[in-house]
Amino acid sequence: MRQKTLDVLEFEKIKSLVANETISDLGLEKVNQMMPATNFETVVFQMEETDEIAQIYNKHRLPSLSGLSKVSAFIHRADIGGVLNVSELNLIKRLIQVQNQFKTFYNQLVEEDEGVKYPILDDKMNQLPVLTDLFQQINETCDTYDLYDNASYELQGIRSKISSTNQRIRQNLDRIVKSQANQKKLSDAIVTVRNERNVIPVKAEYRQDFNGIVHDQSASGQTLYIEPSSVVEMNNQISRLRHDEAIEKERILTQLTGYVAADKDALLVAEHVMGQLDFLIAKARYSRSIKGTKPIFKEERTVYLPKAYHPLLNRETVVANTIEFMEDIETVIITGPNTGGKTVTLKTLGLIIIMAQSGLLIPTLDGSQLSVFKNVYCDIGDEQSIEQSLSTFSSHMTNIVEILKHADKHSLVLFDELGAGTDPSEGAALAMSILDHVRKIGSLVMATTHYPELKAYSCNREGVMNASVEFDVDTLSPTYKLLMGVPGRSNAFDISKKLGLSLNIINKAKTMIGTDEKEINEMIESLERNYKRVETQRLELDRLVKEAEQVHDDLSKQYQQFQNYEKSLIEEAKEKANQKIKAATKEADDIIKDLRQLREQKGADVKEHELIDKKKRLDDHYEAKSIKQNVQKQKYDKIVAGDEVKVLSYGQKGEVLEIVNDEEAIVQMGIIKMKLPIEDLEKKQKEKVKPTKMVTRQNRQTIKTELDLRGYRYEDALIELDQYLDQAVLSNYEQVYIIHGKGTGALQKGVQQHLKKHKSVSDFRGGMPSEGGFGVTVATLK
């Protein structure tokens, strides 16, 4: 992509803002290298990278990259035999520490966001090498400033000797400076250091009272810094030990440098990956600052930017506009007043495309769509000055000639005030001819103009659309709103009237313009009104769609919660049943044990095999913990609406209300209506019955699966319940619903106590929320 285009569209300012978000020189280097890609797959991948990291950044607290720095130069120096110092080793240690923290963060992220995939970050984490040994070797050998005393046995011994010798020197010198006889002879009662030797400050006139070596004197010459002869040999010993210490430190650092050289390839990979992460996190931070969104890239030529705004303008005051090249539109011509925002619209389009192809989220609403352009060409300059000289026209024409040489069908071309700076009639003619040529090349074009001739340009050419920037006549100022499909119109008469020009003058002026031009202005005015009306309706439609989507999401979540609740209740019921069977089984075992003892003691004739067989039947009643039952579906006729079926997964009867498609049907089970897989349904065969039983069967079919006792007195309710249960048993119902309402709870308690004693009821439970909750009791019949 041309550097001139990047400069005109101020891409460097965007890069500078992203650079401000980096932590390390690694990330900064990658920002400085950031350029728009032109390969489709590369552009898509870069956007996926940024979007994934942005999603993580917006939801989680990322590990700190503080202290991360470029270390490749140190690694290369280690590889060729150089020796790294403690500071350089610490930067390498920090690199390893940061990458390990990111590994830990990613592992926690995978656990927290179970089921969510992060392929980009996963790939980068898999690239990171294992450098634990090198980290420990550096960490155990030195701190931020120096090697530890225990970095080696030799170093520890040397430093121990230095410490003890220093202590002896101090003790010796302390005796001298604290001596009462020496107080008046010393400038200060302290021990100091000159030329790495321990000395005392002696007044010049008492020099002869102290044997030793003079190492320095004060600026006035009144103080001499003397190393007393009593500590000269000890100071010499310190110097020898310091030399030994330096040699040992060099040996240790050489050893550590060798470890670094051995892991050079792994370290370079770690540096590369962590630099990429710093770069991507900086992109994510910047994207959040502009509320950026991810565009959808398409192979076919597409530009759709809903509510786009220029990212360098104040987000609070800038007017966002939808910029769109509708189907089959290749050229958009924007007309309207100067300073109305036409140039900003051009720059917004160009800059957003460059940002998107550089892997940056863009300042639009969700749903933007773009194709990938091989190049963006623009001719945008100082056309908004009042006077435009010939040199200005020549400069722009030179730029346009250069654009026409290189533009092709994969290019986006932006012309600002095309043809301006010369005679209006010639400028308009040139503008139309240039647009025709670019359209022939196949480039996508957006151009601004104030020539009225170009308003009619789209009328006799396919693929051309007019647009305009709105002007508020009441405030005499532009609104900066872009009206796609509506050409700009002259507001001279309205503005003049607003400013107080005589109506006679205005009316006379109107008679001087042609009828065609008057009709065009009226048509444009009508288009503006229609555009605003349609735009208002579109915004309302968007709002309703979003509300509908939200309601759908909420209902889906509630349905899922209901299903989970239903499953938990069924599992709980089965668990209770299993516990009862387990208790009965244990009791049977105890009885069998007692009978065996009785038979052995008294020789009683006990048929143990019959007892064991009956005990085994208890095991057959154990409920599987899973809701789904392992029932082999029998093959009957095709299931249609109205069929009675058995729902295999729940073991319940139901009626098919509707066949949704080849795979699903809506089934009524009692008062529950559910969408179920057809393969989970077994059509119940109609029994062949004798004619004498026909009346009985018809009566059964009239019995509902629910009994409403609300409004009944207590005694009447129980009588009605008894009659209903008898009829339900005759109708072969497996489960019925007793509606007693909530009220004081007396009727509910009475119904449930009655059910507990009833011979035909095997179990009962309270209703689920979808079944009526506490106002319903569900009874299972034997």
From Swiss-Prot:
Binding residue positions for ATP: G336, P337, N338, T339, G340, G341, K342, T343
Keywords: ATP-binding, DNA-binding, Endonuclease, Hydrolase, Nuclease, Nucleotide-binding, RNA-binding, rRNA-binding
GO molecular function, one term: endonuclease activity
Keyword NADP listed: no
GO biological process: mismatch repair; negative regulation of DNA recombination; rescue of stalled ribosome
Stretches assigned to the Smr domain: 707-782
Pfam families: MSSS, MutS_V, Smr
EC number(s) on file: 3.1.-.-, 3.6.4.-
Keyword rRNA processing in annotation: no
Main enzyme class: hydrolase
HAMAP family in the record: MutS2 (MF_00092)
Family: Belongs to the DNA mismatch repair MutS family. MutS2 subfamily.
Function: Endonuclease that is involved in the suppression of homologous recombination and thus may have a key role in the control of bacterial genetic diversity. Acts as a ribosome collision sensor, splitting the ribosome into its 2 subunits. Detects stalled/collided 70S ribosomes which it binds and splits by an ATP-hydrolysis driven conformational change. Acts upstream of the ribosome quality control system (RQC), a ribosome-associated complex that mediates the extraction of incompletely synthesized nascent chains from stalled ribosomes and their subsequent degradation. Probably generates substrates for RQC.
Complexes and interactors: Homodimer. Binds to stalled ribosomes, contacting rRNA.
Protein's name in the database: Endonuclease MutS2
Organism encoding this protein: Staphylococcus aureus (strain bovine RF122 / ET3-1)
Gene from which the chain derives: mutS2
